[in-house]
């Protein structure tokens, strides 16, 4: 009938190419899950007592901090920027929050978390102001503030160390708090917080106008500006949110380790970038998901904690592994992602075979 749409068989007959159901982002996430599964199988053969509840709990607790930082980094990278100061922000917020809690033992947990996130947000706003309104490349700005924030912490600490004995008991027990226990596997509160934060932000990116603006600015800043989008405010907000999430990660870092020195958070900037990029976030901006960043964080912490348990591999290879993962992820994004996106945006091919004419009969 003339008023009905062509069915699948008719579309194939007309030469229309059927589109796959999986978007490139979903395909990358499924590939990451496969790599994680293979990694677990390989290390289970190399390491005794590898598949244990205690190791699972250790990986997920460590992953929670990396995942929150990866989410922070992802939001900035989506706007075609990068924040290399997140490790220093973690160090500053962890130390200052610990210092405050040591002097004010009765501080409620919500207020302590808010203090850490507020400090991080202020530091992120400083980064964002210089990038968005000062027009200074983000890699230059955050390399500078990485050193500035760390130097301030060293000067402020004056060789003092925050110890677990000086902190409130609720904070020391926070990483061990369990939401659900399944045999020897504990779903701890710190992991739950990280997952809730990431899922909430992913929903905001996918369903709110703010999320569409973030992707638009990262995809083509000039076009977004011509369309009337407040590109400076969007960039500033991305850095502020990155700082606030880094502050949350600083609080989690403080609760996990208890003992905080001026070296707290060093190296986390590399881990956050690696988790985001390995998770499928394009380093060129405008593409990627927080779910992918979460899986990237899981893979990175799994590899790091697994490699430590293999005696033949030196622990100093950790950064080399992260660097290799970043290079492989970027190469894969350019090689595979480009072809997949071209496939999605290219017009369907028409069949070269001419359509058959219906037979006609003379009256």
Where are these regions (language model features)?
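Helix-loop-helix "hairpin" substructures at the membrane interface of multi-pass membrane proteins
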Residues: 108-116, 122-127, 131, 182-261
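Transmembrane helix-bundle core of multi-pass membrane transporters
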Residues: 138-207, 234, 257-265, 309-310, ...
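Cytosolic-side transmembrane-helix boundaries in multi-pass membrane proteins
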Residues: 1-41, 226-233, 303-363
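Single transmembrane alpha-helix segments in multi-pass membrane proteins
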Residues: 37-105, 129-136, 276-290, 324
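Short loop segments and helix-boundary regions at transmembrane helix junctions
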Residues: 21-24, 77-82, 103-104, 121-164, ...
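Transmembrane alpha-helical segments in multi-pass inner-membrane proteins
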Residues: 240, 246, 256-323
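Hydrophobic alpha-helical segments embedded in the membrane of multi-pass proteins
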Residues: 63-73, 88, 92, 125, ...
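Structural signal for alpha-helical transmembrane segments and their membrane-water exit/capping regions
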Residues: 35-51, 153-157, 201-209
């Amino acid at each position: 009938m003339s008023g009905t749409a062509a069915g699948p068989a008719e579309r194939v007959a007309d030469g229309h190419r059927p589109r796959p159901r999986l978007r490139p982002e979903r395909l990358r996430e499924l590939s990451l899950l496969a790599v994680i599964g293979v990694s677990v199988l390989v290390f289970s053969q190399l390491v005794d007592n590898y598949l244990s509840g205690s190791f699972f709990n250790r990986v997920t607790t460590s992953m929670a901090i990396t995942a929150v930082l990866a989410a922070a980094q992802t939001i900035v990278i989506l706007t075609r920027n990068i924040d290399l100061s997140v490790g220093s922000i973690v160090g500053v917020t962890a130390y200052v929050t610990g210092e405050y809690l040591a002097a004010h033992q009765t501080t409620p947990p919500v207020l302590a978390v808010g203090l850490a996130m507020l400090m991080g947000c202020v530091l992120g706003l400083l980064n964002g102001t210089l990038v968005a309104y000062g027009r200074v490349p983000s890699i230059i700005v955050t390399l500078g503030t990485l050193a500035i924030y760390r130097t301030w912490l060293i000067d402020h600490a004056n060789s003092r160390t925050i110890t677990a004995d000086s902190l409130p008991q609720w904070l020391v027990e926070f990483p061990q708090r369990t939401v659900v226990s399944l045999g020897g596997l504990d779903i701890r509160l710190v992991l739950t917080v990280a997952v809730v934060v990431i899922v909430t932000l992913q929903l905001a990116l996918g369903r709110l106008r703010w999320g569409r603006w973030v992707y638009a600015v990262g995809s083509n800043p000039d076009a977004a500006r011509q369309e009337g989008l407040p590109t400076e405010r969007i960039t500033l907000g991305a850095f502020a949110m990155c700082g606030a999430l880094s502050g949350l990660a600083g609080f989690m870092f403080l609760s996990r380790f208890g003992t905080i020195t001026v070296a707290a958070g060093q190296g986390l900037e590399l881990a956050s970038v690696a988790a985001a990029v390995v998770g499928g976030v394009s380093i060129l901006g405008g593409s990627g998901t927080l779910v992918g960043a979460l899986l990237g964080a899981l893979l990175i912490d799994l590899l790091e904690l697994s490699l430590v348990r293999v005696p033949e591999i030196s622990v100093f290879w950790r950064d080399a592994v992260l660097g290799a993962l970043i290079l492989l992820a970027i190469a894969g994004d350019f090689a595979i992602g480009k072809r997949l996106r071209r496939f999605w945006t290219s017009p369907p091919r028409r069949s070269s075979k001419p359509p058959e004419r219906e037979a006609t009969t003379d009256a």
